[in-house]
Amino acid sequence: MNVEEVQRRLWDDSKAQRQHRESSTPLFPTSPHDGRARNVMDLMHNPTWLTTAALRVMKRSRNKAPGVDGVKVRDFQKGFEDKIEQLRLELKRGTYQPQSLRRVMIPKANGKMRPLGIPCLCDKIVQEAIRMALEPMFEAEFHNNSYGFRPNRSTHHAIFRCQQLMRSKFTWVIEGDVKACFDEISHKAILKVVREKVLDNKFMDLINRFLKAGVQVDGVVQPTEKGVPQGGVISPLLANAVLNKLDWFLHDQGMHGKVRARGYLAGRPDARFARYADDWCVFITRGSKRYAEGLREKIRDFLRTTCGLELSVEKTHVTHVRDGFDFLGFRLIMDTGRSGTNVPKILLGKKAIPNLKERLEDALRRRPHQESVALRVQRASAVVRGWSEYYRIAHDFPRRAGTLDHHAFWIAVKAICRKLDITTAQAVKRYGTRGRIRVGDSCELTRFSGIPMKLDYCGPEDYEPGQSATATDSELEVSFSRYNEKKRPGNMDLKHRVLERDQYCCQQCGCEVDDQDSQMDHIQPVNCFASYARASYFENLQTLCFSCHWSKHYAR
């Protein structure tokens, strides 16, 4: 069996169902009335399908905590084929029973605790097999403005979607959050959306068993009558499938096609949205605050009746874009540019820097006392790189880099003082070099000022069946470059011509650059021309590095 080919057919059939037509070559015998897939349970006990799921889970879970049975990846690798065969037979006979989840509490940013449910390794494998079958079906149905826990999509895509809507003269925004989405989501709603895609009672019974498996707290198993475990393999997909109903409800609140053109002429309100998991924003144009508040009540009623969920009162607000709003850790606000035009800005959220300080202190302090300073600095550097990779799309990231370096330097100095029992002056003299923390010749604390802001961006690529997980940042970078080369060949060719003319050197500082770390700068400002296209002619472009480009435009 070719797993990717099967997923491709599942995706094609589901897409055909959405378009209200029958697939020409369906994988499973389907009813001519609804096009739902049958005999999906046969995939669950197929040796190739189950082995593929096991290998994916073992690769991701190598260093993860075990479930209630205590079995780790290295334990499962011993007699791997026999264990897979036993698991396959249990699924085929219908005797497989998921074990309860191990409950772990982790702190949230607001000081509360978030419950995580850790399944055992065998349950993860079966859940992965379920996900491999369901994901292609649901991806054909998911709305394009949903970005959470989906292949080739990330929080950055959602943020840039919001920026795009702000640029399109959407003035009011409803910033919303679903209250305890994973904990309160209705099992009935989950089974209903799965049943819309699958006509297989055995498969539905398997999903129901996972939903009712329960959680183990202090050795006592507590039943689960609602919600999906945060930590389960299929939990994000099932939650997305239910919230997809909300996406299409919000889609229907806006105007599209010819209706949108007529609505624009008539001055009627229009709405657009972006959603990442249970966080979402609805943007409204040509509408008043009262209209936005009325739409918020419609959303509240829809969630309550269709999904069995409630809006979080303390996190759902109606805000004007000029006042700014928080979304996914960023602060988005409409600012006024130097030429008097409206410019949507992406800024660091108010919790971003305190969160960074806490993580740095934890990386430098919460370890065995005998651990060396070099190892602690390496771990802190990983925190700096990870935090910067997420927040470097913010417009104020370059401006705050020096302040962040200052914070990181003194947090590291204080941690070194505690470990070595020396004074601050001694720590700075031994490890501080021109505002840098350096241990030996090869270990240095990564500096924020050396990380460029992320400028190049384009939308997420279409879903391709066979993708196994949400894309990593490196994979997203590759997809961005493919998108540029494929859909913007003229721009890429012009960039290469400018780079060759400038001999791949920054025209301000003289450093060497390449395709990835170079920027095209307009010698004469764009506002001196009638359009952006007229400003972007060959003679008006020059090569600059990231630092020089942003110093030119934002260091004033």
Regions found by a protein language model. Give the residues of each.
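Non-catalytic, polymerase-adjacent accessory regions of viral genome-replication enzymes
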Residues: M1-D82
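Conserved polymerase palm-domain catalytic core
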Residues: E90-G94, P98-S100, V104, A109, ...
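A conserved non-catalytic segment of reverse transcriptases
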Residues: K212, D218, T306-S372, Q378, ...
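Right-hand nucleic-acid polymerase module
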Residues: P354-T423
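Extended C-terminal regions of large enzymes
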Residues: L404-I411, I416-E485
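Short Cys/His-rich Zn2+-coordinating modules
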Residues: Y483-L494, I523-S531
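Short cysteine-rich loop/turn motifs with clustered Cys
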Residues: G490-Q519, T543-S547
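Histidine-centered nuclease catalytic patch
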Residues: G510-T543, R556
